[in-house]
Amino acid sequence: MVFRKSLLKLAVFALGACVAFSNANAAEGKLESIKSKGQLIVGVKNDVPHYALLDQATGEIKGFEVDVAKLLAKSILGDDKKIKLVAVNAKTRGPLLDNGSVDAVIATFTITPERKRIYNFSEPYYQDAIGLLVLKEKNYKSLADMKGANIGVAQAATTKKAIGEAAKKIGIDVKFSEFPDYPSIKAALDAKRVDAFSVDKSILLGYVDDKSEILPDSFEPQSYGIVTKKDDPAFAKYVDDFVKEHKNEIDALAKKWGL
């Protein structure tokens, strides 16, 4: 009986050790797989001036977040050219990370408590605030002038909630129309199908023209983090350390792109 109990304890211990070993391998697997395949796959946007915008002439995506992604590739693989960029938007970036299509997402992904329960976020690499782009002919001076206005926002973004709460605080009602990408919102604004285009101010800067302006209002500061899967703690730590250790370089890249 004692012999059987000893065997049972040994089996339980062995099983626990196997599970721990398996979990450790899983945690380190992403970083090792990137090194093994010799390529980092990063989800970035392709419609955000300054951050990540498709160059129609070359077919390349260029911008601040692309350069941050290249810096990460250099950190992991020693070569910033060992990278593959996958175009994402606010609606697709999470699912593409979930299904393994990308190793990480660097795509104006705002850090929120709700999102941190689903994904790992690095320390912020950039901070901004939400704003409103409107047509000058509307003569809006602030959100307070926009009672009943229809505001264009991106699908699955934090903007709708932030503007909705701000409007409620000042006692006005606004409506929202959701779009798959930023150019679609700007087109709707130009066609007067929406009264405002709302997203982070530095993004709006890329869409201002002689007929539009950004209102002085700022809403709910946004912090962007590099996003990885929740089950990759070792990779998440590597990415977080990368952001901390390369802060000066990342800040310089932001300035390079006019942010």
Swiss-Prot record:
Protein's job: Common antigen and a major cell adherence molecule. Most probably involved, with PEB1C, in a binding-protein-dependent transport system for an amino acid. May be involved in binding to intestinal cells.
SUPFAM superfamilies on file: Periplasmic binding protein-like II (SSF53850)
Gene Ontology terms describing biological process: amino acid transport
Signal sequence segment: 1-26
Any one cellular-component term (Gene Ontology): cell surface
Species assigned in the record: Campylobacter jejuni subsp. jejuni serotype O:23/36 (strain 81-176)
Keywords associated with the record: Signal, Transport
Record-linked PANTHER family: ABC TRANSPORTER GLUTAMINE-BINDING PROTEIN GLNH (PTHR30085:SF6), AMINO ACID ABC TRANSPORTER PERMEASE (PTHR30085)
Pfam families with a match to the protein in the record: SBP_bac_3
Subcellular location field: Cell surface
CDD domains named among the record's database cross-references: PBP2_Peb1a_like (cd13691)
Gene: peb1A
Chief location: other
Family according to the record: Belongs to the bacterial solute-binding protein 3 family.
The name this protein goes by in its record: Major cell-binding factor
